UniProtKB/Swiss-Prot annotation:
Belongs to the D-glutamate cyclase family. Its EC number is 4.2.1.-. GO terms for molecular function: lyase activity. This is Putative hydro-lyase Pden_0321. The keyword Coiled coil does not apply.
Length: 263
């Protein structure tokens, strides 16, 4: 019998995110699902829903709120305006500011529709339980993320490139890591690419577009997973008038155990 994690741990983590200094959430509340977030005016919501449906690997939708709501069934007592450690405010596709509290920005558009997107942090606990080190957690930093040259399928007014996260994995355990992550397709699932970063248009693994660089040791292979920062690449390319997102690596922690998504 598998013991479920204590929901109080998820609530405590969100409280820490709300009240504390912003920090990446990798390794926080292990055993609970973490999410990417994007909030758009209602006029853009259908375009994004279609964009996510056409690009399920980087944009797996776990919940969609009603217009104007800051609540989610994934954590009914949470507040999506305050319970992420760091938010990004976008205006005309340009990052205007980062803030630990999005309440004021949220009030600018009373019809915001929020999408919660699966995050690969969710399968990091099973990787660790299998004895596979997650390097950015071990180093106490953010996961490295890269903008690739792979186009997502466009939808309505939205288009953009796919973003990937990278984790160094010992060569002999790459297949195991792919199998473990592949059990959770709702949170990006198996890798989209293994080795050869240049095949994704990535020139330098020491210079991620988002997050922090991590050490790659001899005998390790860079493994790339589709990433929920992909919607932010679409914002930069498509330039909707307004959006709120999480800052890359600063996720929304839900009350849902990560085992819920395993198949």
């Amino acid at each position: 019998m598998t013991l479920l994690p204590d929901p109080a741990e998820a609530r405590a983590a969100r409280l820490a995110c709300r009240q504390g200094a912003p920090r990446p959430t990798a390794g926080m509340a292990p055993g609970f699902t973490q999410c990417n977030m994007i909030s758009l005016p209602k006029d853009w919501a259908w375009d994004f829903l279609l964009y996510a449906q056409r690009n399920p690997k980087p944009c797996p939708v776990l919940d969609v709120t009603d217009p104007g709501s800051h609540r989610t069934a994934l954590a009914p007592k949470a507040d999506l305006r305050t319970d992420i450690p760091l938010y990004r405010i976008w205006r005309d596709g340009v990052l205007a500011e980062e803030t630990p509290d999005a309440t004021a920005a949220w009030a600018e558009h009373p019809d915001l529709v929020t999408f919660l997107i699966g995050c690969s942090f969710t399968f990091e606990t099973p990787l660790q339980q299998a004895g596979i080190e997650v390097r950015h957690i071990a180093q106490g930093c953010n996961v490295p993320m890269f903008l690739t040259d792979r186009d997502c399928r466009p939808a309505g007014r939205l288009h953009g490139k796919m973003v990937v996260s990278m984790r160094p994995i010992p060569a002999g355990r790459v297949a195991e890591a792919a199998m473990i992550s592949g059990r959770t397709p709702a949170v990006h699932g198996a890798p989209v690419h293994i080795g050869a970063p240049e095949a994704l248009g990535i020139a330098d693994l020491s210079r991620p577009d988002f997050g922090d660089p991590v050490q790659i040791r001899p005998g390790e292979v860079p493994v790339f997973w589709a990433c929920g920062v992909t919607p932010q690449a679409a914002l930069m390319a498509s330039k909707p008038p307004f959006a709120i997102t999480h800052a890359p690596g600063y996720m929304f922690i839900t009350d849902v155990p990560d085992t819920h998504w395993q198949v």
